[in-house]
């Protein structure tokens, strides 16, 4: 089986949704690079996201984030994980829609909380009531994430690998995004590894 990615796949969703882990596995299975906009921003700024938020503020960060995403979308097709707030920017959303395909990893709040509650690397959760903050962020952001081209409803118990196969299967329904050589013979590509 040979898959060919024609557009960059942009993983969107809440912090803790698995965008980086699932994105890495998806990129591996497709044989394309994996890029992370947060890692690219940190490398360019020589500072962590938390430090950038503290030093320069969220507005400055969002401007730089949009610039980095635009640069990454202009490159060869890859799998790109973006920060939880990146897709909220209308111009960034439009660019992703024009130049790539957005995949929303939709994860239940309890599962998100179980993944992020012990991490100190989430500047937006540095509040007196971080779970309530996470719930409020999800309530605000999910209607915007729902604008993504493809939705994957991640379930508790799904492995990273299984989640990636679900994303790949959804991508295979879009011939403008992914061509799977085995598809013409009736294969669905799930056994490609």
What are these regions (language model features)?
Residues 2-4, 25, 29, 139-193:
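NTP-dependent small-molecule kinase module
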Residues 11:
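Hydrophobic anchor at the beta1->P-loop junction of P-loop NTPases
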Residues 98-143:
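A glycine- and Lys/Arg-enriched "phosphate-lid" helix/loop adjacent to the NTP-binding pocket
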Residues 22:
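Hydrophobic positions on the alpha1 helix immediately C-terminal to the Walker A/P-loop
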Residues 78, 102-103, 151-152:
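Short, well-ordered beta-strand core segments
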Residues 36-97, 121-122, 135:
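ATP-dependent small-molecule kinase phosphotransfer cores
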Residues 19:
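Conserved lysine of the Walker
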Residues 14:
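P-loop (Walker A) phosphate-binding loop of NTP-binding proteins
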